[in-house]
């Protein structure tokens, strides 16, 4: 099957396969689980929290680094598809706890791959990586999958090493693994530790709670490749269905957006003027890979994917999500 489509018969997916999703309670995990349920999958989820946040999922609370528990779950579920999203998902998380963060991202990947090596070597596994595996200073044009990998952050290193480990299991154990190098994405439900959600929350606080009409920002002189999370999870689904074994795929919009544009778009949501306070110690893009725009030609050609949601719609929905969240807390 090497070099052929990871799944070369749509009949297989008409049989409601068992789909295992690690990190299901995360920002992307929740969106992906809901999409897969709509597409008729039997979704099983793994995360560290006590309860699953997605209705309709068979849930297992566990530590992804616990190899024996991962193997037992895989033996029980017998998944045909595995989306591996579990791990520390932000550079700031690595800065605060580098040792444990690195262990989670690396050992969690090994636990999942090794379990599938012994339980179900025919399953298709998607390892979600990051654009931080690239060196943002390397390419004046868009990054393609052929660009060298040279991460400049500890988080990027963890994703780079995870991909190397995945390639080892492809070559030496014949596992059917595909890889993403996912660029920045945002949308409803994202943590305010990320720039778009941070600003949307601050503006919503002013509107809902009559907070002081002032927004705190850091440096906004950055151009960033943003995708809507709903486009991203659809790309993951299509890579699972049509991606090629051992291949990496950039998941990105292919367009750069200036942070200043995003800021002023969100400020326009307010019914009253908002002053801007620049904090020199605050980095607007601390969890955002800045200066890095991707090329998505390979993903488009091999899976038929294309981004459908413009950044303005993404920001509209993100802002409205925050308004609803704050209104619920208010009452």
PLM ranges: what are they?
Residues 15-17, 311-331:
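Amphipathic terminal alpha-helices
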Residues 19-38:
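N-terminal Rossmann NAD(P)H-binding glycine-rich loop of SDR-like oxidoreductase domains
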Residues 56-66:
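Rossmann-fold cofactor-recognition segment
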Residues 64-104:
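NAD(P)H-binding glycine-rich loop region in Rossmannoid oxidoreductase-like domains
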Residues 96-99, 103-111, 124, 132-179:
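Catalytic helix-loop patch of NAD(P)-dependent Rossmann-fold dehydrogenases
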Residues 137-142, 164-224, 229-238, 256, ...:
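NAD(P)-dependent short-chain dehydrogenase/reductase
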Residues 214-215, 219, 247-249, 258-264, ...:
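C-terminal "lid/loop" region of Rossmann-like NAD(P)-dependent oxidoreductases
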Residues 232, 236, 251, 262, ...:
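Non-catalytic, hydrophobic alpha-helical segments
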């Amino acid at each position: 099957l090497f070099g052929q489509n990871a799944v070369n018969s749509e009949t297989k997916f008409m049989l409601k396969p068992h789909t295992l999703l690690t990190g299901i309670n995360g920002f992307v995990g929740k969106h992906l689980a809901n999409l897969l349920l709509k597409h008729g999958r039997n979704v099983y989820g793994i995360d560290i929290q006590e309860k699953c946040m997605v209705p309709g999922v068979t849930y297992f609370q566990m530590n992804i680094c616990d190899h024996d528990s991962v193997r037992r779950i895989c033996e029980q579920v017998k998944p045909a598809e595995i989306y591996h999203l579990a791990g520390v998902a932000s550079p700031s998380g690595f800065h605060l706890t580098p040792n444990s963060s690195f262990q989670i991202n690396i050992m969690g990947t090994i636990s999942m791959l090794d379990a599938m090596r012994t339980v179900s070597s025919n399953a298709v596994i998607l390892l979600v990586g990051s654009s931080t595996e690239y060196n943002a200073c390397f390419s004046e044009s868009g990054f393609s999958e052929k660009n060298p990998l040279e991460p400049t952050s500890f988080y990027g290193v963890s994703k780079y090493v995870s991909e190397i480990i995945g390639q080892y299991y492809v070559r030496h154990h014949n596992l059917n693994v595909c890889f993403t190098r996912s660029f920045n994405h945002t949308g409803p439900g994202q943590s305010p530790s990320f720039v778009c959600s941070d600003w949307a929350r601050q503006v919503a606080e002013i509107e809902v709670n009559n907070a002081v009409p002032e927004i705190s920002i850091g440096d906004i002189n950055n151009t960033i490749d943003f995708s809507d999370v709903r486009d991203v999870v659809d790309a993951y689904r299509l890579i699972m269905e049509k991606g090629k074994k051992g291949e990496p795929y950039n998941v990105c919009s292919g367009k750069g957006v200036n942070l200043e544009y995003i800021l002023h778009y969100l400020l326009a949501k307010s019914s009253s003027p908002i002053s801007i306070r620049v904090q020199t110690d605050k980095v607007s893009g601390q969890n955002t890979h800045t200066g890095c725009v991707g090329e998505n030609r390979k993903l488009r050609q091999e899976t038929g994917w294309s981004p459908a949601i413009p950044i303005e719609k993404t920001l509209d929905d993100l802002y409205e999500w925050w308004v609803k969240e704050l209104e619920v807390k208010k009452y």
